């Protein structure tokens, strides 16, 4: 009897993969996670590689969708009744929480991709009941199918909710393409329990250190929250302390004080919170719920579990007298009453007017015969306690039109911040106004260079005296700021000339200035000689120069290739560039240029993979780029670490052949994070390397890839693959080419 038959006889499951076993990540958690480089492949996408979402969205009758959404707002369902007979507040929260996971630190999170449908977001404590919101939307999604993504539909629904309650929104852009699996690249924190308190001695993975310094790139105060704890920091009902948390988390979402006040005051003009009873009545989140609940979670045993008995946050707050109508009542109430601390029926900290003021002024969500006093959250009172917030809030109170405009703009920014430039916006509701946070670039207003011009330019570039290393590193510095997460950065705009990028240490400002000045001379002379208004932008010239250098380096390796080049980039101005907003695009470390501070050396492999993921690279693409950039001399500061070749500037596969040479023995050097490669026989030092370099020989999967490029017959494949990966990075922000 074989083992599987024996297992059946004993009533055991013969399929061990059905049981919970430890993964490689469990056994070796310090190894870089290459899985994040292979997310959202065609293997997980049911729509197929030929699916063109932009084309489908353009064929959508958007007015019909909006009409259906407006009808849905007041079509209350018994299985999840609408507060005040209107789902507006619920759908605003759904859209807000879809977009509000965005953080400027790495551009991850946000509404793009519709990640609220998947773990962990679909089961975060802050997203209780949003499973019902999406289920209410299903008939509309089902009706319009592929023409509108879940990601777009959730944001559009939030807009329609606002419009249906009398508020004029700033606009709406489609173009968010659904993903079909959870995003494994986003770091949400190291805590192992939901809502772990930062001051809990049992929380060994607190996201805070020092004087409440929040770990980067996180933008929420606790695991499972979007921003802040509405009861105050760690549940402490201190409005001033809450203001500090609000300012930090909203700033990490790229919001300033005025936008923050507008969002909180505008959003809390509508709807209510839900805390009808104790939290122990609430069942498991969707990911842990029973299969018969069909993806719905948090089933409540308190009363009917819905409507007047609903428990979501545990808070029971109605802010205004007209919770389904736009008004200035939120600010009027905030400053019109003095507030005292109380508790919700669930025992959560909230606030009510002192001395019974305001009693009977606020409607009940379900009983027309019941009335209430208005109520507030600790985070609402923060807008009054913090001097800067108070000044802004009082100005909005006295100027309702300014408040409405500020909220409309802040809401648009909230819901579109991760979409990248306006070139990606789709639909008839896109606002005409160009906004600084969209990283605008000028439109192309001149004929572009042709093939003959490109050939002539390459000759001028290669005879300019600039080296292969200088040209390649400058092009890489320009293009590699791109982030696939929020579609920011990249070569278009030539912001490598502008603050803050021109001053980043990794870009070697003095060397960069030399290269750019030389290219500007070539640009000026060439444009002056052209006729018919034809021009080349500096943004294009930087990329063309990098390609010309690579062609030269490949030729010296005995291989003739042409690096693809597509003109069409333009040059942005400093006035079109928000210096503060661009600062987070500066990489803490750039393994591609072997620029890693000593304090980050231990995690340099993780940082490299993270950077590769933001550049939308696969593991093979990352590998071939490292090998090519090293031999081309693109290291910051001209460092020789990882330059495993005796012929730098030649596009050879020497990095891989020498890394994999068993005649070399590697040992730590005296300098932190640096290693020496000794000849096993003579003991002489042959090479020096960083942890990033050696990762391609030590990490089993990366070594397997390195072996492909280290073979005797791999030179042609290496050059071909390097050029393809290089071109992908150079064109990463060319949405006009898609």
Curated annotation (Swiss-Prot):
One Pfam entry name: peroxidase
Enzyme Commission no: 1.11.1.21
Residues of the site described as Transition state stabilizer: 93
Binding site for heme b: 268
GO cellular component terms listed in the entry, alphabetical order: cytosol
GO molecular function list: catalase activity; heme binding; metal ion binding
Keyword Heme applies: yes
Family: Belongs to the peroxidase family. Peroxidase/catalase subfamily.
General function of this protein: Bifunctional enzyme with both catalase and broad-spectrum peroxidase activity.
Protein name: Catalase-peroxidase
Annotated source species: Beijerinckia indica subsp. indica (strain ATCC 9039 / DSM 1715 / NCIMB 8712)
Gene that encodes it: katG
């Amino acid at each position: 009897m074989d083992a599987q038959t024996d297992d059946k006889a004993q009533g055991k499951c013969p399929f061990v993969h059905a049981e919970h076993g430890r993964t490689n990540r469990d056994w070796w958690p310090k190894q870089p996670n290459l899985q994040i480089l292979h997310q959202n492949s065609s293997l997980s996408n049911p729509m197929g590689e030929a699916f063109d979402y932009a084309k489908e969205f353009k064929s959508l009758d958007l007015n019909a969708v909006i009409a259906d959404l407006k009808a849905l707002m007041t079509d209350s369902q018994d299985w999840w009744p609408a507060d005040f007979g209107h789902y507006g507040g619920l759908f605003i929260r759904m859209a807000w929480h879809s977009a509000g996971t965005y953080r400027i630190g790495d551009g991850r999170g946000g509404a793009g991709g519709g990640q609220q449908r998947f773990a962990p977001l679909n089961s975060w404590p802050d997203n209780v009941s949003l499973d019902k919101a999406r289920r209410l939307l299903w008939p509309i999604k089902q009706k319009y199918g592929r023409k509108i993504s879940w990601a777009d539909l959730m944001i559009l629904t939030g807009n329609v909710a606002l419009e249906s309650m009398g508020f004029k929104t700033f606009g709406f852009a489609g173009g968010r393409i659904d993903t079909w699996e959870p995003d494994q690249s986003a770091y949400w924190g190291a805590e192992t329990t939901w809502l772990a308190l930062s001051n809990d001695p049992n929380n060994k993975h607190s996201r805070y250190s020092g004087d409440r310094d929040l770990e980067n790139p996180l933008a929420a105060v606790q695991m499972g929250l979007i921003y802040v704890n509405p009861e105050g920091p760690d549940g402490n009902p201190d409005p001033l302390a809450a203001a500090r948390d609000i300012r930090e988390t909203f700033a990490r979402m790229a919001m300033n004080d005025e936008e923050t006040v507008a969002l909180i005051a505008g959003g809390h003009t509508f709807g209510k919170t839900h805390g009808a009873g104790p939290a122990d009545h609430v069942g498991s989140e969707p990911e842990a719920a029973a299969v018969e609940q069909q993806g719905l979670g948090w089933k409540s045993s308190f009363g009917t579990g819905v409507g007047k008995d609903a428990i979501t946050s545990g808070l029971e707050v109605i802010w205004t007298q007209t919770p389904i109508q736009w008004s200035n009542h939120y600010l009027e109430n905030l400053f019109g009453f003095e507030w005292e601390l109380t508790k919700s029926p669930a025992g959560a900290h909230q606030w009510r007017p002192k001395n019974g003021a305001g009693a009977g002024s606020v409607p009940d969500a379900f009983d027309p015969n019941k009335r209430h006093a208005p109520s507030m959250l600790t985070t609402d009172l923060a807008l009054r306690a913090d001097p800067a917030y108070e000044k802004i809030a009082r100005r909005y109170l006295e100027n309702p039109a300014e408040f409405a405009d500020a909220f409309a703009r802040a809401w648009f920014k909230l819901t579109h911040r991760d979409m990248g430039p306006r070139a990606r916006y789709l639909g008839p509701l896109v606002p005409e106004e160009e906004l600084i946070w969209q990283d605008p670039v000028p439109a192309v207003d001149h004929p572009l260079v042709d093939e003959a011009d490109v050939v002539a330019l390459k000759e001028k570039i290669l005879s300019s005296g600039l080296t292969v290393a200088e040209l390649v590193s400058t092009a890489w510095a320009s293009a590699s700021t791109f982030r696939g997460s929020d579609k920011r950065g990249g070569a278009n705009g030539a912001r490598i000339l502008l603050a803050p990028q021109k001053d980043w240490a990794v870009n070697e400002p003095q060397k960069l200035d030399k290269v750019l000045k030389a290219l500007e001379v070539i640009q000026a002379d060439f444009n002056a000689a052209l006729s018919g208004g034809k021009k080349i932008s500096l943004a294009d010239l930087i990329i063309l120069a990098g390609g010309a250098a690579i062609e030269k380096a490949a030729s010296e390796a005995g291989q003739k290739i042409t690096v693809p080049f597509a003109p069409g980039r333009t040059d942005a101005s400093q006035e079109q560039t928000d210096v503060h907003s661009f600062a987070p695009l500066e990489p803490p470390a750039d393994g591609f240029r072997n620029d890693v501070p000593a304090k980050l050396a231990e995690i340099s492999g993780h940082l490299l993979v993270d950077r590769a993921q933001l550049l939308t690279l696969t593991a093979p693409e990352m590998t071939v780029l490292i090998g090519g950039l090293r031999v081309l001399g693109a290291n910051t500061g001209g460092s020789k670490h990882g330059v495993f070749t005796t012929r730098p500037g030649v596009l050879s596969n020497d990095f891989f052949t020498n890394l994999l040479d068993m005649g070399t023995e590697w040992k730590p050097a005296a300098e932190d994070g640096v290693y020496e490669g000794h000849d096993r026989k003579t003991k002489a030092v042959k090479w020096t390397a960083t942890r990033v370099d050696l990762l391609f020989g030590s990490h089993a999967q990366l070594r397997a890839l390195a072996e492909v490029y280290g073979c005797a017959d791999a030179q042609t494949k290496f050059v071909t693959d390097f050029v393809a990966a290089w071109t992908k990075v150079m064109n990463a922000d060319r949405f006009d080419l898609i």
